[in-house]
């Protein structure tokens, strides 16, 4: 990525942040672009994403991940089925004071995540190579986020053991899922649905917030 291209992407991040209601953050933008470069560099080796075009990666991965940042307020968060680190790494870059753990069962992807954590200097990130249903952390999380990881019902059932009571699931979905929301398990209750607007992306995006309402 040339210096001129970096300046253009920084300008787009500034504009996107204004639209999302986030402050401009030059240090975070620099790390996000470094992360984008790592995604592009290692994608062929690690098969991190089907997207090959760097501008499409910027829109569908970086901006899409940032679009949820104004809503997710969990201080200790786990990103399940994180793949190449989405949305976890962008959130960890934006909120260095929060703990963001990245879980995936694919060893190639977790190797990339370990490398990305080191190169980006993300001290608030831990990489977990595990199947989600078999992972039992010593300390429970107050937030679980996923990005098109599974059906909403599967997400809740596979991850409820990771979450504190009164903690929240944050499910990023490509479209409204009324049927899924109407059939929540008894340990979960609907909180809010946020409609997301990602610059340069002509597609529906929603963030579903669900509260864990009892011990299971």
Swiss-Prot record:
Residues bound to S-adenosyl-L-methionine: 81, 86, 132-133, 147
Gene Ontology, cellular component aspect: cytosol
Methyltransferase among keywords: yes
Keywords from the named record: Cytoplasm, Methyltransferase, rRNA processing, S-adenosyl-L-methionine, Transferase
SUPFAM superfamilies: S-adenosyl-L-methionine-dependent methyltransferases
UniProt GO MF annotations: rRNA (guanine-N7-)-methyltransferase activity
Cell compartments where the protein resides: Cytoplasm
Task performed by this protein: Specifically methylates the N7 position of guanine in position 527 of 16S rRNA.
UniProt name for this protein: Ribosomal RNA small subunit methyltransferase G
Provenance organism: Hydrogenovibrio crunogenus (strain DSM 25203 / XCL-2)
């Amino acid at each position: 990525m040339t210096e001129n291209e970096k300046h253009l992407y920084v300008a787009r991040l500034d504009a996107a942040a204004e639209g999302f209601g986030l402050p401009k953050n030059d240090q975070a933008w620099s790390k996000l672009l470094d992360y984008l470069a790592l995604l592009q560099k290692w994608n062929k080796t690690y098969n991190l994403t089907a997207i090959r075009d760097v501008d499409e990666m910027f829109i569908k991965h970086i901006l899409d991940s940032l679009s949820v940042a104004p809503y997710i307020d969990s201080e200790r968060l786990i990103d399940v089925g994180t793949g190449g680190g989405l949305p976890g790494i962008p959130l960890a870059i934006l909120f260095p004071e929060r703990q963001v753990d990245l879980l995936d069962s694919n060893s190639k992807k977790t190797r990339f995540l370990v490398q990305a954590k080191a190169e980006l200097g993300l001290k608030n990130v831990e990489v977990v190579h595990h199947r989600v249903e078999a992972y039992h952390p010593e300390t429970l999380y107050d937030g679980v986020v996923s990005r098109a990881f599974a059906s909403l019902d599967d997400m809740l059932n596979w991850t409820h053991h990771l979450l504190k009571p009164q903690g929240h699931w944050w499910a990023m979905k490509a479209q409204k899922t009324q049927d899924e929301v109407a059939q929540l398990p008894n340990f979960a209750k609907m909180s809010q649905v946020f409609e997301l607007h990602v610059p340069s992306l002509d597609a529906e995006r929603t963030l579903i917030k669900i509260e864990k309402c009892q011990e299971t």
